Amino acid sequence: MRLVILFLFMTMSFSLLADVPLMVKGNSTTDQSPKEITFQKAEIATVIVFLSAMCPCSDSHIPYLKKLKEEFPKVTFVAIHSNVNEDAKTTEAYFKKVNLPFDVIQDDEAKIADAFRANKTPHSYIVSKENKILYEGGVTSSAKAHQASEFFLQQALLDLTQGREIKQK
């Protein structure tokens, strides 16, 4: 039994430290212009958050993500839209309306989502300049951001920007 637990722990730890792509690229959801975010160019690190144009949970986190971007200006933020069941017109209209202060990249074939093994929204990652995943998890503890009791992404960013090891990975 101990061996099984050790194996599971090592597997999860390895995946957290695994290399990720050197960049994310695709077209903007709002104007279709090409976008390319290279992690090594970030001042501190890059937050990647997978969002949906139709998910109420994702939508409830938009104001909170705007606040986080304002709170952590030296951190690069980028959103990825990978939901293939959401048409381009709906997606474009939604992301224009919410007006995020960072790029939203359309991931038409879900290649970015596959590379990060992202399968829900909102889901976030912090990627270091060395292309290592420092944090993977929810943005908050609730499907509705305003009802959250824990703010996972914010705590991870506080740990990172204050030179501490990220407690929650």
Regions found by a protein language model. Name each.
Residues 3-12:
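Sec-dependent N-terminal signal peptides
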Residues 15-18:
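Boundary at the C-terminal end of the N-terminal hydrophobic targeting segment
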Residues 24-46:
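A short beta-strand-turn-helix
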Residues 38-59, 65, 157:
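Short active-site neighborhood of thiol/selenol oxidoreductases, capturing the structured segment around
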Residues 43-46, 73-76, 100-102, 129-130:
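Loop/turn elements at helix/coil->beta-strand transitions in domains of secreted/extracellular proteins
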Residues 59-98, 106-115:
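Structural microenvironment flanking redox-active thiols in thiol-disulfide oxidoreductases
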Residues 95-128, 133-136:
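Short, internal strand/loop/helix patches
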Residues 128-169:
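Thiol-/selenol-based redox modules, centered on thioredoxin-like
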